[in-house]
């Protein structure tokens, strides 16, 4: 995906870029001097298993508080669902708590959806920095 973005997308005029993808997991593709950077072990872009919350949720890798426990679609959906069940108000319906619905609500100014997306963004930013 980082190569496609480098050749055809927003970073095509950049020699160095990082594409971070949040989906089922969290990963990064790194372009350095116009070439994909893989690293010695081939896992340099595996940012999803960097521990960002030592007392956080258990990750499927066995560790606690990995970035993926915060910044992956399922984690975002679960966080919003838990908050809705606690009684927080939102445009996101309890029976349709999907990443698509959450993002649409955030774009329309929903305070709960926006707060969760902001929370995710802050953790992504700290990890990348």
Positions of PLM-derived features:
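Phosphate-binding/catalytic loop of phosphoryl-transfer enzymes
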Residues: 1-74
